[in-house]
Amino acid sequence: CIRDRDKLFGSYGVYAADPFHESAPPIDTPEYLTGVGQTIHKLFQTFDAGALWVMQAWSMREDIVKAVPKESLLILDLNGSKTAANGGWGYPVIAGNLHNFGGRINMHGDLALLASNQYQKAKARYPNVCGSGLFMEAIEQNPVYYELAFEMPNHADSIPLQAWLAAYAERRYGAKSAAAGKAWMYLLEGPYRRGTNGTERSSIVAARPALNVKKSGPNAGLGIPYEPMLVIRAQSQLLKDADKLAFSKPYRFDIVDVQRQMMTNLGQLVHKKAAEAFASKDKAAFALHSGRFLELLRDMDELLYTRSEYSFDRWLMEARSWGETKEEKDLMERDATSLVTIWGADGDPRIFDYSWREWAGLINGYYLPRWQKFYTMLQGHLDAGTDYQEEGLSLAYGREDFRANDFYNRLAEWELAYVDQTGKARTPVTHGDELVVTRRLFDKYLKLSREYYADFSGVGEIKEERTYENVGEE
């Protein structure tokens, strides 16, 4: 295998290997693990005398690491947690941030932590820290986070964050706007507040339906870890200077993103009201709140349809472009669909929705029908005067299992059929004007927000103990 690589690419000095990544070794003894480290090191050195082994710290083991000379190993500490725990045992370490899992779409990220200059702090504590890195699983979300993170290694100390954000807004939008600067202060107090690094919160939109929705993906759960009106105030400020800033493509991206966050946050409370109405057997209230929730999903799809960055249709068309024959193109579409839905090839996946995305096309074609089927099922129970019980169902990573009961089994068959369906992409991949659609939906959901947030009490201390989660260890 390594010789075949040499024929294709030649030797290039740097080689990656992560033994037992997110898994357990067959023999977990110091002697065995030391042997693993020595064997891999010898393989690399035999192939390339100057080889540098690059290893992720995610699942690294001390005995494997210490079997390799320090000059022959570079550790990538994806989220900085291992460096904080053991200093990398004196080995060269790149200490970084793992800000996004699976390409999930959610505004978050501890900007104050970045502005404090993590690299310089880590370097001062551990001289073996030799670099800073970003190890996100996907991009095209939270551009402010990445802009600041990539800038910080150029600074010798911390920076004044509020001043940086004001300059960022002007630089990003290409014009001075006090309102835009104020908007970013609200966002700093809200989704970019302290403690919001690591795993993004779940999405009610992308969650597999349940009365008590716990998670969308297999990691962090639902919840809004800040006062949700802060996002609404930010959007109000961004729209104030729309006539001045509408020429700016980054501005148009941001107003869509903030509107998306405003609506997905609100969706958590709307569905909660629908679930409460079902529990109390209030048919009128159930119809009102479930109807509003489904309408919110349709509106989100329309909103996100205005930007190619939020286009499932673009994703599918680009995937199909890699195929030469119809069979290859269909396979590429199936795999691209599977990645953002069931996350696997079998009929009973456990890490389904790992890579959920709030995307146009995926909402309209996948998430919305799931919720429609669920609410229709609940309505049937209301009409028949029967109960629907979720308590005691088998769970997979804190959510109802893929086939936890009859409803989920039927839903699973529909989901698997959706993955196999071809020709799903809509053309063109975008439709509508971002500013026109955003303004209309802001006015519409501002009114509903005032109603649903009237008694909101969901903001509390952010719990950090599950900030980073390894889905390989349940």
List where the protein language model places each region.
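Catalytic-core regions of glycoside hydrolase
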Residues: 3-201, 205-226, 232, 279-294, ...
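N-proximal short alpha-helices
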Residues: 105, 141, 239-247
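Short, solvent-exposed, charged loop/turn and helix-capping segments
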Residues: 241-255, 303-318
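Long, low-complexity, intrinsically disordered segments
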Residues: 464-474
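Polar/charged low-complexity regulatory segments
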Residues: 223-245
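Feature representing long, continuous alpha-helical segments
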Residues: 166, 185, 232-236, 261, ...
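Short, small-residue-biased leader/transition segments that mark boundaries at the very start
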Residues: 1-2, 298, 305-460
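Ordered core of a single globular domain
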Residues: 248, 252-301, 396, 400-403
